[in-house]
């Protein structure tokens, strides 16, 4: 004869392996962790980047001594076209953009937990990250889907399938995000290693010089690159013959503002 004993258990407890917005955005300490997460996945072309293999965030390139600096430039067919199979820069970029969008949308609800300077600093980081990631994508793909808000899953296809914007609209948005970041960021960074106002200005200048060069010189050479979205008909690669002159003048002007 067996006896089954059943004890009453309270299973309605908060999982300890899930970090909530209250944990991350409720204090400067939590936001420092959020910043570490963002910047550890930023597509900076430094020691974790090679043209042939893209971005590697696991330290693998560094351990091999072929991290894209100096002698590495002559190794392993480094100049071949990077196709992205090993390191999907497209999907990785949108994961980072999602995190930046979440910061921009959610941090205002926790504003009372920060001083004015702290709040502005972290908001500026969100806009800077989004601007920089879009910039790196535009360099590689031209016009990209401008996902500027968090997308709830699951959802209908019209909410999830955001088409690529034109290349000109993409660069315009990058400029706008950099300007917003610059307006928030202080002259002196509140955290070591994170950009201040002048670092954001420098990256904006770099992005706008790149955009202006593409707008001007791609449109004036034989065999220029251009392309249109299959569904939208939007010029996702290159600039319109009617607008490229105004575009490159605008971008070059933005570079030194």
Which ranges hold each PLM region?
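Conserved, well-structured interaction surfaces
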Residues: 27-28, 32-48, 67-141, 157-194
């Amino acid at each position: 004869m067996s006896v089954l004993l059943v004890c009453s258990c309270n299973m309605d407890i908060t999982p300890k392996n899930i970090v909530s917005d209250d944990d991350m955005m409720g204090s400067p300490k939590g936001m420092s962790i959020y910043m570490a997460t963002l910047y550890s996945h930023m597509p900076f072309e430094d020691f974790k980047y090679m043209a042939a293999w893209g971005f590697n965030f696991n330290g693998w390139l560094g351990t091999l001594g072929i991290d894209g600096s100096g002698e590495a430039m002559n190794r392993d067919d480094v100049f071949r076209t990077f196709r992205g199979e090993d390191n999907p820069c497209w999907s990785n970029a949108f994961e980072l953009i999602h995190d930046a969008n979440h910061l921009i949308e959610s941090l205002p609800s926790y504003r009372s937990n920060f001083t004015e300077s702290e709040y502005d600093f972290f908001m500026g980081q969100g806009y800077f990250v989004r601007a920089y990631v879009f910039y790196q994508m535009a360099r590689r793909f031209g016009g990209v889907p401008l996902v500027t808000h968090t997308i709830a899953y699951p959802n209908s296809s019209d909410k999830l399938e955001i088409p690529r914007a034109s290349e000109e609209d993409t660069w315009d948005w990058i400029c706008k995000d950099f300007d917003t970041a610059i307006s928030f960021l202080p002259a002196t960074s509140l955290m070591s290693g994170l950009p201040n106002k002048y670092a954001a200005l420098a990256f904006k200048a770099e992005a706008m010089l790149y955009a202006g060069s593409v707008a001007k010189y791609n449109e004036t050479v034989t065999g220029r690159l251009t392309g249109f979205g299959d569904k939208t008909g939007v010029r996702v690669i290159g600039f319109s013959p009617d607008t490229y002159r105004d575009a490159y003048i605008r971008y070059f002007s933005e570079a030194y503002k």
